[in-house]
Amino acid sequence: MTRRYWNINLEEMMEAGVHFGHGTRKWNPRMAPYISAKRKGIHITNLTKTARFLSEACDLVFDAASRGKQFLIVGTKNKAADSVARAAIRARCHYVNKKWLGGMLTNWSTTETRLHKFRDLRTEQKAGRLNRLPKRDAAMLKRQLSHLQTYLGGIKYMTGLPDIVIIVDQQEEYTALRECITLGIPTICLIDTNCDPDLADISIPANDDAIASIRLILNKLVFAICEGRSSYIRNP
C-alpha cells in the first residue's frame, strides 16, 4: 500500500477539538499510549498519533476505492448523523445514521429481503400505484415505506456486504463493530479515550462527541475515497 500525503494538519485538528477526550474517570487504560496529558479533569489525545493513524486510514481507503471497493459509514448518534449522511453521499458510500438494526450484516439475507421490499414500495409510489389502493391499505404501505426509508435509506443501493466499514463511535456502534469482526470485514473506527483501541483494524484516536471533530475526520477519509474513485475511473 503506497503512502501518500493527506494534508493532515495538527493546528486544524486542535481548532476542531479533536484532542479533547472524556473525563479521566471514564477512560479505558488501553488508551494510555494515545493520551498525552490530563487537563482540567479530562484526558488529552496525542494528536501526532491521531495524524499517523488517520493517514494510514486514508491510504487504506484510497487503495480500496482505487480498486472499486464498497464502503459503509456508520454513525447513529445525533451529533454524528448529519455529518455521516453528508460524507457518505459526497463519496458515494452506503451509510447508516439512524439506528443499527441488529443482524444488518450478519443476517444479510434478511436485510436483503427488506431492501427488496423497500425498492418495490418506492417503485410503486413513484408510479402512483399506492394512491390507487383503498385508503387504509395505502396508508399502511406508506408507513412501511417511511419506516424503511428511515432505517435503510442509506443502504438502499447496497447489493452485498461492504468491503470496509467506517465507524464514528465505537461504544455507540458496538453491535455494528462486532458484526464486522464476526464477518472479517475490515474496520476503521474513531475511538475516544473511553474506547478499546484493539478492536478495529485501524483505530483513530479522536474526540467522537464534537461535531467539528467528527466532520474533520470524515472529510479527510471521504477526500481519500473520492481520490481513489477518480483513480479507478481513469484506470479501470
Curated annotation (Swiss-Prot):
The organism's place on the tree of life at top rank: Eukaryota
Cellular component per GO, a single term: chloroplast
Keyword Cytoplasm carried by entry: no
CDD domains recorded: RPS2
InterPro entries attached to this UniProt entry: Ribosomal_uS2 (IPR001865), Ribosomal_uS2_bac/mit/plastid (IPR005706), Ribosomal_uS2_CS (IPR018130), Ribosomal_uS2_flav_dom_sf (IPR023591)
Chief location category: plastid
Gene Ontology BP term (one): translation
Pfam families reported for this sequence: Ribosomal_S2 (PF00318)
Gene Ontology terms for molecular function: structural constituent of ribosome
Location of the protein in the cell: Plastid, Chloroplast
PROSITE patterns reported for this sequence: RIBOSOMAL_S2_1, RIBOSOMAL_S2_2
The keyword Plastid is assigned to this record: yes
Keywords, in A-Z order: Chloroplast, Plastid, Ribonucleoprotein, Ribosomal protein
Stored HAMAP family: Ribosomal_uS2_B
Family statement drawn from the similarity comment of this UniProt entry: Belongs to the universal ribosomal protein uS2 family.
Name of the protein described by the UniProt record: Small ribosomal subunit protein uS2c
Native source organism of the sequence: Eucalyptus globulus subsp. globulus
Encoding gene, per UniProt annotation: rps2
